[in-house]
């Protein structure tokens, strides 16, 4: 729990920092400090190993630029030396004018692009320090210095918590269809595609590198000997990310997971003309959740044989072209791809050049706040599609912030996918039965529909009973002191409670996970009740208005 408490404490400090205002800022600024502490621990670990073998070791960061020198000088008792440790304006000035320029130079001085040193230069070339207060910066440094990355347990806990911060960032960044891909879904996709040592794994829209990190976790269990490990480290994972912050996070995320020098580059995948892709460029495995609904310049659209304005459809063409013959892919995409008329040519291309063997239909709520339904396409290149196995995921509950998708939800899919078994949730479609537009819509022929034997009159009575019960329950829950004029005006806006009310004076991020879930559940219940209240207020108000109008007519009649 040390990492969770530290991350929460750092977020609280950053909330008071003028240069940071969003979850994206919190993650970015925490990341570069965490990264430098990680490098210091890595240097110490390598120094010990070198000393035990009698070898010389040159640390990655040298002299005063080491974390242990500028950030956390220690007393003889092992505590931070408050006398010699910089703080305030001196610390902020050192970071901006000396540390960052020093780190950016690594891109020029590294022996090759395939080194950790080069990646350090790349990362800090994209970064700037947004923590303008040197006092806030000192507080954060002291918190991070308490963390350690020596043991496997330490590293695992850190990556788990780092992923949770990435999740917050992903759900805060909603431009151009960018959403955080739930890790249980990624792990399931990786298991189905089953990448092997010696195969290349590619994500051309890698975001925070979730697919690449999970593929690494999966494949490292297959490592036998130093040659396999070298292959996994240097010649396996490839990613491209267009935007600077996700690129930085992706690179750090892979390093934290254990890939020393990730092959992730910053660039626009869609700027690559399909006609320029050579056999040597192609990859054996593609795992991706491409952005949807974004926009590209006209010259970028010209790189694709099938004309489209939808970025996800451009990426689909790229995937098909980039796969080696015999290569495998697992792709998350909006379910409208299956049926939209403007995607029919692309569906036909996919079915002709690849074996689209599996479509996993995901329920709403998998991507929090996205408001779209998605599917996962599993296909192999080199053989045309003859049959498609569908699986309609039904977790038996509404997915959301407090009811996220889990690996248990996907267990039945994984089990049945091995044999393409038919069930209430799965079925097979023969491609020869498809129409000219190759409509791949999810139409479950095996779903058991409960037949309602009630008469129309009985159904109407049930609806009336439900409306009356709901209205009574809501009125019981309402307290009229939430409205002005002692509850006389039911249709006025609620009066906000004072900010200093005791039960509102708390820090959400400081709560335990259990309490957070309780708060989230209460928020959802309140939101649902407010929605119901709005639904019943309108007809009630209309009835009252009608009665008041009749009342006014009677008064006017008597005045005459």
Predicted regions and their residues:
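Non-catalytic, mostly N-terminal accessory regions of nucleic-acid modification and defense proteins
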Residues: 1-197, 265-272, 277, 361-364, ...
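Conserved, well-folded catalytic cores of nucleic-acid-processing
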Residues: 13, 147, 164, 168, ...
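Conserved Class I SAM-dependent methyltransferase catalytic core
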Residues: 22, 244-247, 308-379
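A generic structural signal for well-ordered coil/turn residues at beta-strand boundaries
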Residues: 23, 282, 286, 372-373, ...
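Conserved nucleotide-binding/hydrolysis micro-motifs of P-loop NTPases
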Residues: 41, 244-245, 270-271, 291-294, ...
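Conserved S-adenosyl-L-methionine
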Residues: 176-288, 293-295, 300, 307-309, ...
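Hydrophobic alpha-helix feature that most strongly marks membrane-spanning transmembrane helices
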Residues: 220, 255, 291, 321-324, ...
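Conserved P-loop NTPase
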Residues: 376, 380-412
């Amino acid at each position: 729990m040390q990492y969770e408490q530290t991350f929460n404490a750092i977020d609280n400090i950053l909330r008071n920092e003028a240069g940071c205002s969003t979850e994206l800022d919190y993650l970015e600024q925490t990341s570069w400090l965490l990264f430098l502490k990680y490098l210091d621990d890595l240097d110490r670990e390598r120094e010990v190993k070198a000393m035990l073998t009698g070898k010389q070791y040159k640390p990655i960061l040298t002299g005063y630029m080491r974390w242990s020198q500028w950030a956390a000088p220690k007393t003889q008792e092992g505590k931070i030396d408050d006398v010699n440790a910089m703080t305030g304006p001196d610390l902020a000035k050192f970071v901006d004018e000396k540390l960052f320029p020093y780190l950016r130079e690594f891109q020029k001085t590294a022996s090759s692009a395939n080194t950790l040193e080069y990646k350090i230069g790349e990362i800090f070339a994209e970064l700037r320090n947004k923590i303008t207060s040197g006092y806030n910066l000192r507080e954060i440094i002291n918190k991070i210095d308490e963390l350690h990355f020596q043991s496997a347990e330490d590293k695992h806990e850190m990556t788990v918590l780092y992923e949770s911060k990435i999740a917050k960032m992903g759900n805060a960044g909603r431009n151009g269809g960018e959403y955080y891909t739930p890790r249980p879904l990624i792990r399931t996709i990786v298991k189905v595609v089953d990448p092997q040592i010696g195969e290349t794994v590619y994500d051309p829209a890698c975001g925070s590198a979730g697919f690449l990190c999970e593929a690494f976790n999966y494949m490292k269990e297959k490592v036998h000997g130093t040659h396999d490990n070298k292959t996994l480290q240097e010649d396996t994972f490839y990613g491209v990310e267009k935007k600077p912050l996700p690129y930085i996070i992706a690179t750090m995320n892979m390093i934290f997971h254990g890939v020393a020098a990730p092959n992730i580059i910053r660039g626009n995948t869609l700027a690559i003309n399909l006609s320029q892709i050579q056999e040597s460029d192609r990859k054996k495995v593609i795992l991706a959740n491409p952005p949807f609904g974004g926009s590209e310049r006209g010259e970028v659209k010209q790189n694709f044989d099938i004309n489209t304005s939808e970025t996800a459809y451009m990426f689909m063409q790229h995937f098909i072209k980039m796969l080696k013959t015999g290569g495998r892919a697992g792709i998350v995409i909006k379910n409208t791809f299956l049926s939209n008329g403007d995607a029919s040519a692309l569906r036909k291309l996919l079915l002709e050049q690849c074996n689209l063997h599996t479509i996993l239909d995901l329920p709403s709520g998998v991507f929090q706040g996205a408001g779209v339904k998605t599917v996962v396409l599993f296909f192999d290149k080199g053989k045309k599609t003859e049959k498609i196995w569908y699986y309609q995921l039904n977790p038996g509950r509404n997915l959301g912030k407090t009811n996220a998708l889990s690996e248990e939800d996907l267990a039945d899919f994984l089990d049945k996918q091995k044999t393409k078994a038919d069930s209430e949730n799965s079925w097979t479609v023969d491609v020869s039965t498809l129409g000219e537009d190759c409509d791949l819509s999810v139409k479950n022929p095996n779903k058991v529909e409960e037949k309602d034997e009630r008469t129309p009159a009985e159904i109407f009575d049930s609806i009336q009973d439900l409306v009356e019960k709901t209205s009574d329950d809501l009125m019981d829950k309402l307290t009229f002191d939430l409205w002005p004029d002692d509850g006389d005006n039911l249709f006025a806006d609620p009066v906000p409670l004072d900010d200093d009310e005791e039960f509102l004076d708390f820090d959400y991020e400081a709560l335990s996970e259990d309490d957070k879930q309780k708060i989230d559940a209460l928020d959802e219940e309140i939101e649902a009740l407010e929605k119901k209240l709005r639904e019943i207020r309108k007809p009630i108000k209309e009835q009252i208005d009608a009665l008041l109008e009749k009342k006014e007519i009677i008064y006017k009649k008597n005045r005459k």
